[in-house]
A protein has these predicted regions:
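Short, surface-exposed loop or secondary-structure junction motifs
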Residues: 1-124
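Short, structured beta-strand/loop micro-motifs enriched in basic residues and often containing a Trp
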Residues: 131
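Short, well-ordered beta-strand elements
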Residues: 140-142, 147-156
Length: 182
């Protein structure tokens, strides 16, 4: 896990799959990942920090454990709580930038679920979960109510939200609305 990867790490990067004419076409990692390997005046979203699946899962476990990982305190409990608390002004009603994700706000670095799924089309999940997804259809989430974390890494462009909906339905069940009492 590092910001701006050394060239020697390029062979370890997953290839990118691009949806073209209804088929997935594999793109070479060197062509798909150039912004991870050079200095940029401004790094666009989706580039810069790169990690392994294992490290990302450790990060998620640390968050679900309120800042502790393998017995070591990494972040204060209050920091994790602040990160996972909606920081948006309630006056901001337009949330079209989060299609299919339901009633969510935004914490520091995460979307935060504010109410149970209201429609069958919404992603399954629990109130208080926090998550983020990436341009290449990646997803991670932390569900404190169920003590659950998930890291779902595919490298598919353009973004495909149906993968997330189907993955969450497989984890929670298609009719899940949250733990009892939500």
């Amino acid at each position: 896990t590092a910001w701006r990867q050394p060239d020697a790490k390029l062979p370890r990067f997953a290839a990118m799959n691009v949806q073209t004419d209804g088929k997935l076409v594999q793109q070479d990692a060197a062509a798909a990942q150039p912004l991870h390997f050079r200095d940029n005046a401004l790094t666009p979203g989706g580039f810069g920090l790169a990690s392994t699946l294992d490290d990302y899962q450790r990060f998620a476990r640390m968050l679900v454990n309120k800042g502790t990982l393998d017995g070591a305190r990494i972040l204060k409990r209050s920091t994790v709580k602040l990160m996972a608390t909606d920081q948006l002004d309630p006056a901001i009603k337009e949330r079209a930038w989060l299609p299919g994700k339901g009633a969510v706000g935004f914490g520091f670095d995460f979307a935060v679920r504010k109410s149970p799924p209201q429609t069958h089309e919404e992603n399954r999940g629990a109130v208080g979960e926090f998550f983020w997804d990436g341009a290449a259809s990646t997803l991670f989430w932390v569900d404190p109510a169920n003590k659950l974390t998930a890291v779902f890494f595919v490298q598919t462009m353009p973004y495909d939200g149906t993968l997330h909906r189907d993955f969450r339905a497989a984890v929670y069940g298609p009719d899940y609305k949250g733990p009892p009492g939500d």
